[in-house]
């Protein structure tokens, strides 16, 4: 049976430490039902797909929570991040080639041709994604340490 990961505890600690007023929801928005998480800057809501992550180990649950919390900080506290991250937040590249650009507070979209591997690499290379992944990894490493690195016997 999977352990019960306390999303709310880590969420509340993160928000308190950074004076962020955010919401946490486990009801994924439309079109994000298969995602592990997302952040919506308009509603200041971190969405975590707890049902999808239920069977995953706690360190994976923590990773996705901290990843989305980092996105919240990127959007709401841009002064703490460099111009490269701030600029990259205007663009979203989906795994399927759907791309978005933030223009006057609204996203415009287009669909590019290509395979999923290509778009996955583009997605993972976006500066705000690299930063969120690095931050989440460091947080998980602090929480779980060597549990992540058991060498095969």
Task: Say what each PLM segment does.
Residues 2-19:
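Zn2+-dependent metallopeptidase catalytic core
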Residues 26-47:
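Catalytic zinc-binding patch centered on the HExxH motif and its immediate surroundings
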Residues 48-64:
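Short pre-active-site segment immediately N-terminal to the catalytic Zn-binding motif
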Residues 63-75:
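Active-site recognition of the HExxH zinc-binding catalytic motif
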Residues 77-118:
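Post-HEXXH active-site segment of zinc metalloproteases
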Residues 118-134:
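Active-site metal-coordination segments of metallo-dependent hydrolases
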Residues 138-147:
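Short arginine-rich
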Residues 149-153:
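Conserved small/polar residues in nucleotide/adenosyl-binding loops
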């Amino acid at each position: 049976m999977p352990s019960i990961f306390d999303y709310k505890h880590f969420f509340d600690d993160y928000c308190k430490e950074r004076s962020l007023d955010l919401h946490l929801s486990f009801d994924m928005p439309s079109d994000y039902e298969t995602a592990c998480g997302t952040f919506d800057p308009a509603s200041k809501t971190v969405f975590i797909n707890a049902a999808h992550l239920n069977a995953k180990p706690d360190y994976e649950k923590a990773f996705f929570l901290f990843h989305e919390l980092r996105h919240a900080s990127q959007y709401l506290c841009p002064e703490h991040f460099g111009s490269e991250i701030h600029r990259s937040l205007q663009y979203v590249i989906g795994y399927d080639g759907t791309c978005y650009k933030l223009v006057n507070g609204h996203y415009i979209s287009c669909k590019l041709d290509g395979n999923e591997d290509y778009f996955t690499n583009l997605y993972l290379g976006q500066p705000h994604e690299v930063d969120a992944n690095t931050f989440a990894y460091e947080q998980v490493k602090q929480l779980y340490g060597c549990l992540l690195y058991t060498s095969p016997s």
